[in-house]
Swiss-Prot record:
Residues 374-396 are annotated as: Disordered. This is Serine/threonine-protein kinase 32B. GO terms for molecular function: ATP binding; metal ion binding; protein serine kinase activity; protein serine/threonine kinase activity. Keywords: ATP-binding, Kinase, Magnesium, Metal-binding, Nucleotide-binding, Serine/threonine-protein kinase, Transferase. Belongs to the protein kinase superfamily. Ser/Thr protein kinase family. SMART domains: S_TKc. It catalyses: L-seryl-[protein] + ATP = O-phospho-L-seryl-[protein] + ADP + H(+); L-threonyl-[protein] + ATP = O-phospho-L-threonyl-[protein] + ADP + H(+). ATP binds at residues 29-37, 52. Its EC number is 2.7.11.1. Coiled coil: none annotated. The active site is at 146 (proton acceptor). Its cofactor is Mg(2+). Residues 23-283 form the Protein kinase domain.
Length: 414
C-alpha cells in the first residue's frame, strides 16, 4: 500500500530575490576574518554551494563594512576557472550573505598542516593555474593583496582556486596602491617600503611575490624568510637587504630559476605577468590551453572520503555560537513579533543608523539571473570576453553597485 512519495523541489518565483529560505544549511566548514562559512544546498536546483555569512553589527563595530562591500563589488564582475566565483549575495536583519562555488578539497594551509608533500610537478601546475588567475585579475585592474596557502582552495580534482577578496583593491592606469595591506610573511618588499615612506607605491607585482613565497612554502614546508605577524617592519626590510634565500639542492634548476624570478626584490625586474612567466624556460613545455581547461591533472588529489577542513568548526557553530544559523528563522520571527512592543530593547541611535545604511546600500547579486538576462539579450553583450565582467557591467538589474560612501565609516559600539 506504500505510495510513491516523491519529494519535488520547491519552485521559486523567477522575479523573487534569492534569500536565506532558498537554501538548506548542511554544515559549518570554516571561518575567516570577516565571517563564517557553511555548506548549503539550493532548494530548487539542488546545487551545492559554500555560503559565507557576516554579522552586520559585528562588521559595523569592527569597521569592516566597507571591506565587505568592496569584496562584493569586485566579485560580482569576475568569473574564472581558477577563482572562487560569487553566485548570490543577499541580506537579512542580522547578516550579510555571499554564496560562492563549493570547493571541498580544502585550502593549501590545511594540507600543509596535514604534512602533505607537494611534488615539483604539482607545484609547477599550481603556479601556472594561479598565473592565469592573476593575469585575469590584472586585466580587470585588481590587486588581490593576500595570496597565501590559506586563500587557495582545491576542488575535488586538485585544481587551485583563489578566494577571499576582502582586502583586494582596484588600480587604474598608472595608479599605485599605497596602503599597508596583506599578511606579513607573504607581503612584497615594496609594500613595507611604502609604509616606511621609502617607496612610490605598489602594483600587480606584489601578488606575484606572494605566489613565489607560497610556491616555496609548498615545496619546502616553510617560508624563505623568518617573518611573522609580530616581526617589526624595519627588521623585515633589513632581512630583505641582508639575507639570501636558500633553495633546496634537490630541486631542479628550472624550478629554482622560476622561484628566483618570482622572489626578485625589485618589482620592475620581477616576473609579474602571464607573458613574463610563459617566457621562463622551465615552463616552455607547458600547454597553456590545457591548463586553462583543467585538462592537466595535479599530482595531489584531495581525499574524497573526508571533509578537508577542521571538524571543530561544526562544533563551534552548534555549541559556542550565540546566534547559530540553524535557529535563524525562529529567532528572526521572534524578534519581528517583539519589535514595537514594550519588551523591545532599542539599539543606540548611531548603531541603528549604521544598520539602516547597510541595509539600503548592500550589494544584491544573482549570477543565475544575470545568465538568464544574457541569454535573452545576448546581442547587447561583449562576447569577446572570456570572463563575465564586461557583460555583467552592462546588466545592472541583477546587482546593486553602491558602495558605503558617506556613513558608518567609523566603528560604533552597541
Amino acid at each position: 500500500m506504500g505510495g510513491n512519495h516523491s519529494h519535488k523541489p520547491p519552485v521559486f518565483d523567477e522575479n523573487e530575490e534569492v534569500n536565506f529560505d532558498h537554501f538548506q544549511i548542511l554544515r559549518a566548514i570554516g571561518k575567516g576574518s570577516f565571517g563564517k562559512v557553511c555548506i548549503v544546498q539550493k532548494r530548487d536546483t539542488k546545487k551545492m554551494y559554500a555560503m559565507k555569512y557576516m554579522n552586520k553589527q559585528k562588521c559595523i563595530e569592527r569597521d569592516e563594512v566597507r571591506n565587505v562591500f568592496r569584496e562584493l563589488q569586485i566579485m560580482q564582475g569576475l568569473e574564472h576557472p581558477f577563482l572562487v566565483n560569487l553566485w548570490y549575495s543577499f541580506q537579512d536583519e542580522e547578516d550579510m550573505f555571499m554564496v560562492v562555488d563549493l570547493l571541498l578539497g580544502g585550502d593549501l594551509r590545511y594540507h600543509l598542516q596535514q604534512n602533505v608533500h607537494f611534488t615539483e610537478g604539482t607545484v609547477k601546475l599550481y603556479i601556472c593555474e594561479l598565473a592565469l588567475a592573476l593575469e585575469y585579475l590584472q586585466r580587470y585592474h585588481i590587486i588581490h593583496r593576500d595570496i597565501k596557502p590559506d586563500n587557495i582552495l582545491l576542488d575535488e580534482h586538485g585544481h587551485v582556486h583563489i578566494t577571499d577578496f576582502n582586502i583586494a583593491t582596484v588600480v587604474k592606469g598608472a595608479e599605485r596602491a599605497s596602503s599597508m595591506a596583506g599578511t606579513k610573511p607573504y607581503m612584497a618588499p615594496e609594500v613595507f617600503q611604502v609604509y616606511m615612506d621609502r617607496g612610490p607605491g605598489y602594483s600587480y607585482p606584489v601578488d606575484w611575490w606572494s605566489l613565489g613565497i607560497t610556491a616555496y612554502e609548498l615545496l619546502r614546508g616553510w617560508r624563505p624568510y623568518e617573518i611573522h605577524s609580530v616581526t617589526p617592519i624595519d627588521e623585515i626590510l633589513n632581512m630583505f637587504k641582508v639575507e639570501r634565500v636558500h633553495y633546496s639542492s634537490t630541486w631542479c634548476k628550472g624550478m629554482v630559476a622560476l622561484l628566483r624570478k618570482l622572489l626578485t626584490k625589485d618589482p620592475e625586474s620581477r616576473v609579474s605577468s602571464l607573458h613574463d612567466i610563459q617566457s621562463v624556460p622551465y615552463l616552455a613545455d607547458m600547454n597553456w590551453d590545457a591548463v586553462f581547461k583543467k585538462a592537466l591533472m595535479p599530482g595531489f588529489v584531495p581525499n574524497k572520503g573526508r571533509l578537508n577542513c577542521d571538524p571543530t568548526f561544526e562544533l563551534e557553530e552548534m555549541i559556542l555560537e550565540s546566534k547559530p544559523l540553524h535557529k535563524k528563522k525562529k529567532r528572526l520571527a521572534k524578534n519581528r513579533s517583539r519589535d514595537g512592543t514594550k519588551d523591545s530593547c532599542p539599539l543606540n541611535g548611531h548603531l541603528q543608523h549604521c544598520l539602516e545604511t547597510v541595509r539600503e546600500e548592500f550589494i544584491i547579486f544573482n549570477r543565475e539571473k544575470l545568465r538568464r538576462q544574457q541569454g535573452q539579450g545576448s546581442q547587447l553583450l561583449d562576447t569577446d570576453s572570456r570572463g563575465g565582467g564586461q557583460a555583467q557591467s552592462k546588466l545592472q538589474d541583477g546587482c546593486n553597485n553602491n558602495l558605503l560612501t558617506h556613513t558608518c565609516t567609523r566603528g560604533c559600539s552597541s
